[in-house]
Amino acid sequence: MSGGLAPSKSTVYVSNLPFSLTNNDLYRIFSKYGKVVKVTIMKDKDTRKSKGVAFILFLDKDSAQNCTRAINNKQLFGRVIKASIAIDNGRAAEFIRRRNYFDKSKCYECGESGHLSYACPKNMLGEREPPKKKEKKKKKKAPEPEEEIEEVEESEDEGEDPALDSLSQAIAFQQAKIEEEQKKWKPSSGVPSTSDDSRRPRIKKSTYFSDEEELSD
């Protein structure tokens, strides 16, 4: 099969089912005809009791067709059931969507705590082995080339003057530049300057010893 699941062609509509059958019961009954992807029993919205109608989504349309031919008009627990390929009502995408039930403290079937639906006492056909959880594969990050790693390490020293090979030289060099800039932009009197000089950028002492000063507004 190509193109993924096709609910409009691989979903079997089954009616006149015994009301006592659970999702797990139907899963076990219909799995003999092919890979069952999802079982949906129609229930009363108030009482949550089965209406005797269910949709069985198979992995492929051949399994669905084999199922309808095998069980249509056949007896199941004393009831003659009807089976046919379900008619698409435009809600196929919603039907196929996986639903996650995060509350694992209660059984989905009966609402009682202490067990999950796979082991619910209401399952007429007994317990069903839970499906194996798929392991999430962690995407491995491609290792960066060694050349790039070396460049990153070297980039930490970008902007420094090669002549400043010691910390004391760097401090002296930086301080001299700061004093020189302060003299250049220092106003001649104590009166605040209203000229364009007041709007010129001032040099702020950098905490990082390099030949790149930080400008303050």
Swiss-Prot record:
RRM domain ranges (all copies): 10-88
Span list, region Disordered: 120-217
One Pfam family cited in the UniProt record for this chain: zf-CCHC
Gene Ontology MF terms in the entry: RNA binding; zinc ion binding
Keywords, alphabetical: Metal-binding, mRNA processing, mRNA splicing, Nucleus, Phosphoprotein, RNA-binding, Spliceosome, Zinc, Zinc-finger
InterPro entries linked: Nucleotide-bd_a/b_plait_sf, RBD_domain_sf, RRM_dom, RRM_dom_euk, ZCRB1, ZCRB1_RRM, Znf_CCHC, Znf_CCHC_sf
Induction: Up-regulated by morphine. Down-regulated at 30-36 degrees Celsius while it is up-regulated at 39 degrees Celsius.
Gene3D superfamilies: 3.30.70.330, Zinc finger, CCHC-type (4.10.60.10)
UniProt-recorded name of the protein: Zinc finger CCHC-type and RNA-binding motif-containing protein 1
